[in-house]
Amino acid sequence: MINLKLDNETFELRNEANEITLKEFNKIYTILQSQTLGKLEQYCEVFKTLGLPEAIIYDMDNDSFIELIKSFNAMTITSELPAKEIELNGYKYVAYTGDEFKFKTKDLIEIEKSAKRGVTNFPSFILAIIFKRADLTVNEHYEKSHLELKAKLFEDNVKADFAIPYITLVAKKTLKSLEDGK
């Protein structure tokens, strides 16, 4: 949490992954991926998403704003190990068994499709694709409406720190594929 003191008033800006909801994280992700916003405007939108008043943001001097961006980006990640399973609404969702997470080809195909479609809640979709219920068939699991419903379920029930290890794995896998020319 960043405490920002301006004009004799203190404002709190959440910048830790365990303080930010997955729904907010989806918005932040979409803002930071925007091709139409400049970098400063992106951070203005991010800070507004996290509750900092627009008037305060736009009234800051540039040096203070840049320092705020640097402080915000100093987020600490508490765990790099992805969760194996989670229970939501009475259902157990499992990402992997065994000691280590490995991508399934179908998961990567669906993640790639979601990215190309430009879904606005891409981090939630990553979780929706990776976490599966044992009582569903493969076809049921990958059904678009099921994935949308499950993405919303994750948005409503987890913080960003739950999703970040998986997003990191997807990013690393994508970079490796690009480096390998795949």
Protein language model features and the residues they cover:
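Charged interaction scaffolds used for protein-protein
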Residues: M1-K182
